[in-house]
Amino acid sequence: MSNEPPPPYPGGPTAPLLEEKSGAPLTPGRTSPAVMQPPPGMPLPSADIAPPPYEPPGQPVPQPGFVPPHMNADGTYMPAGFYPPPGPHPPMGYYPPGPYPPGPYPGPGGHTATVLVPSGAATTVTVLQGEIFEGAPVQTVCPHCQQAITTKISYEIGLMNFVLGFFCCFMGCDLGCCLIPCLINDFKDVTHTCPSCKAYICTYKRLC
């Protein structure tokens, strides 16, 4: 065996440094930064194209003319739990005073009616409602002459007189006693007529 030293190691300190693809040699302790290269056939992005601005989630896009419930009309925010005070309202049953147009307002128990007279002029006549024609004169308006009158009454023999006469005969009251009910006005029917034009108005029957 010879005593010559072994040849130098290929990766020893005397080996030449490796070069990057760009041609710059790598220094000891420094690594090449990773560069993202687009795949073949895809163009590089332009520097003028910027990503869209970031919008935080949960913010709805306001509609034109819409005012959120927590925002006033002038754009200011109201604190949570705050509600504007209600406007003034009149109490129930209150009617504000004011001028009312004049008109023919009927009184209690009556209504107004317009009657055309032969001359062609319109005349307003008040007809009383709810009048009860009984055994006494009644104040009303004559439907014929349109005058406010008090009716004239007259008595006529009616059904109640005949019923009482037959009852007297059944009880044995004969010899003309059965005719006594026909002489009593409280048992007769009452006819109401107009004292002005003598027209018939109504008949009150004691017994229908």
Swiss-Prot record:
Coiled coil: none annotated. GO terms for molecular function: metal ion binding. Residues 1-13, 50-67 have a biased composition (Pro residues). GO terms for cellular component: cytoplasmic side of late endosome membrane; cytoplasmic side of lysosomal membrane; nucleus. It holds the Pfam family zf-LITAF-like. Zn(2+) binds at residues 142, 145, 194, 197. One of its GO terms (biological process) is intrinsic apoptotic signaling pathway in response to DNA damage by p53 class mediator. Keywords: Apoptosis, Endosome, Lysosome, Membrane, Metal-binding, Zinc. Residues 1-70 are annotated as: Disordered. Residues 122-206 form the LITAF domain. It is found in: Late endosome membrane; Lysosome membrane. The LITAF domain is stabilized by a bound zinc ion. The LITAF domain contains an amphipathic helix that mediates interaction with lipid membranes. PANTHER family: CELL DEATH-INDUCING P53-TARGET PROTEIN 1, LIPOPOLYSACCHARIDE-INDUCED TUMOR NECROSIS FACTOR-ALPHA FACTOR. This is Cell death-inducing p53-target protein 1. It comes from Mus musculus (Mouse). The gene is Cdip1.
